[in-house]
Amino acid sequence: FLFIVQGEGRGHLTQAITLEDMLQRNGHEVVEVLVGKSSSRTLPGFFNRSIHAPVKRFISPNFLPTTDNKRVNLKKSLAYNLLKLPEYFRSMYYINQRIKETGAEVVINFYELLTGLTYAFFRPSVPYICIGHQYLFLHRDFQFPDKSPVQLWMLRFFTRMTALRSSKKLALSFREMERDDEHQIVVVPPLIRREITAIQPEEGNYIHGYMVNAGFADTVESFHTMHPEVPLRFFWDKTETEEVVRVDETLSYHQIDDVKFLNGMANCRAYASTAGFESICEAMYLGKPVLMVPAHIEQDCN
């Protein structure tokens, strides 16, 4: 197997770690992991420590935040990525070369746009499978929220682009849904890591949290000003800061580290996050109350 992983946030990286472990335990081999990168994201240390296959990087499209660093700025993101098209074409050429040179028999795509475009333009002979909760958005029975029709169309269009010419789409879901053979979608349970299933959760006194965009620190601090007695421990991707930023006795920010993150999740009172998928599944599995604050249209749908 060859993995191609979108490098935005923690979720797709966590899925790749979990699936590699599952495949290896069943006698399969992951020959290489290709991870998309951009100027605004660095690869978290926990990924390099946890994944066993060789990791290679390629330049990939990414979404730029608004000036307050909370939600995605769609117009700015579109303009930025159009300017980067020559680099993305080089990345597609590189992905095609790695598919050939690794001798992989199957490619697994973790919602990376350039995988779909590579298969559209270069037509590799190796079959590929897409995996991610986002493929539920293409399922005939998925219920969308009452949001902008244009943004919902763009979300579904982007999701289709990640899966051009794919053999199958594995849609991760909390609940069971029928197969959608017309769209080659099979609904499967979330990829929960063995570390989570082995944890004995306890109820602590603090709120555990994760924010992809550090701009949400303003919101956290507003809550903290009103409720200074509530301990808050938030993880973020703000790489230019110390490993732990301790604001005061009851508020601290931590660089994303999976072992510390899972321990924090296991012993917290409740979990607060942008409305991603993987960490929400982990919190639900451990029986923790969850607060979700959507940061973009995909998370509105989540």
Where are these regions (language model features)?
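A short, glycine/small-residue-rich beta-strand->loop->alpha-helix junction that serves as a flexible
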Residues: 5-17
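Conserved nucleotide-sugar phosphate-binding/catalytic loop shared by glycosyltransferases and other
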Residues: 7, 25-83
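Short, polar loop motifs at secondary-structure junctions
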Residues: 35-41, 111-114, 172-177, 234-243
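An aromatic- and histidine-rich active-site surface loop
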Residues: 42, 107-122
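A donor-sugar binding/catalytic signature common to diverse glycosyltransferases
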Residues: 107-110, 262-302
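Active-site-proximal region of nucleotide-activated glycan assembly enzymes
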Residues: 122-187
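Donor-nucleotide binding loops and adjacent catalytic segments primarily
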Residues: 189-268
